[in-house]
Amino acid sequence: MINRFSIEKVKGLEIIDSRGNPTIRVFVRTNDGVESFGDAPAGASKGTREAIEVRDENGLTVKRAVDIANYIIDPALHGIDVREQGIIDKILIDIDSTENKSKLGGNTIIATSIAALKTSSKALGLEVFKYIAGPRLPKIPIPLLNIINGGLHAGNKLKIQEFIILPIKFNTFKEAFFAAIEVYRNLKGLISERYGKIYTAVGDEGGFSPPLEETREALDLIYTSINNAGYQGKIYMGMDAAASDFYDPKKEKYIIDGKELNPTQLLEFYLDLAKEYPIVYLEDPFEENSFDMFGELQNKLNSTIVTGDDLYTTNIKYLKIGIEKRSTKGVIVKPNQVGTISETFEFTNLARRNSIKLVTSHRSGETEDNFIAEFAVGIESDFIKTGAPARGERTSKYNKLLEIENKFGLEYGGKYFYL
């Protein structure tokens, strides 16, 4: 008897992401004709320990990744029960046989892994978030909205990569999200008034890139916008420093705001900012090997969630180091960094067991697929990072969260969040 859940076909397709770059979409179809897909996102700022993408012609195509899906992965997964996520991912890992997924490509593998999960949930007639959550009743995560861009995400002189708002003190996700939109609109008007309308054009993640030179200029703009919108004490602030990008390893200095700072001086810089602004979130404040400096900052900023992205790259090996050194209270969760859904689950489960906050994140190169929103709800992520409330590939995620809240009545995580 044919198993209706068995995989009948795996097929790759070259598509484009939100930056116009090629990426891979993988379809997985069962014997019963149930089919879904997974898209591989791509980052601009990447940790050196991330899974390696397979690309051709200086990154201009992913034809080889498509061929890998069609001619290597397809026969390898043929006949496998699509509900067996662990088995599917192990097959992919074993065929690849490299630590950084460079043989099959992290992009090919994660697209296949996502496609299998989505096809399985569809075959069982379940929403993706319900399939992941199981019997648990999850909450809607608090959004981290990147509304001013710097670093590799912008063309200005700001070194900090993302300036973020966190709408926390609200009863529902809808209330929180639309309050954040008010701040975003207020900021747009402020930038237009001070720097000209041309600087209200949005970047890769929907944030603005005004001609600013120093960190406090950006923080002042956002703080003013929060106050003007009337949300002081309800909407807080955060930053993704992406400090590896402004670290000079030869000098062992951080080049920021026209100064060269050693690690201790940079730590003091962050402490001063936390005194001046309602900053409750600080991501990648030091370069990606500085577990001890992360821990020292977290110890001194107890009410701020210091978070590791490049520090961990969603890899359990590095998370164990961070746990041992008590480096952070938060971890970024990006499935494409490690390559499979199963490995991502291992990472999030270990973080949860150690009371570390989960921050599920998009990448700067995204597609219109809203999988990451459902994934964030399913794992009961504390936060979700998916850009500003602009650009279709960002708003598709927010709209999915609004839909889930409206349809299933899930509670908002901010309602129970204490700083």
From Swiss-Prot:
Signal peptide: none annotated. Binds a second Mg(2+) ion via substrate during catalysis. Pathway: Carbohydrate degradation; glycolysis; pyruvate from D-glyceraldehyde 3-phosphate: step 4/5. SMART domains: Enolase_C, Enolase_N. Its EC number is 4.2.1.11. GO terms for biological process: glycolytic process. Its cofactor is Mg(2+). It is an enzyme of class 4 (lyase). The active site is at 205 (proton donor), 334 (proton acceptor). Coiled coil: none annotated. The keyword Metal-binding applies. Transmembrane segments: none annotated. Keywords: Cytoplasm, Glycolysis, Lyase, Magnesium, Metal-binding, Secreted. InterPro entries: Enolase, Enolase-like_C_sf, Enolase-like_N, Enolase_C, Enolase_CS, Enolase_N. It holds the Pfam family Enolase_C. It catalyses: (2R)-2-phosphoglycerate = phosphoenolpyruvate + H2O. GO terms for cellular component: cell surface; extracellular region; phosphopyruvate hydratase complex. Mg(2+) binds at residues 240, 283, 309. GO terms for molecular function: magnesium ion binding; phosphopyruvate hydratase activity. It is found in: Cytoplasm; Secreted; Cell surface. Catalyzes the reversible conversion of 2-phosphoglycerate (2-PG) into phosphoenolpyruvate (PEP). It is essential for the degradation of carbohydrates via glycolysis. Belongs to the enolase family. PANTHER family: ENOLASE. This is Enolase. The gene is eno.
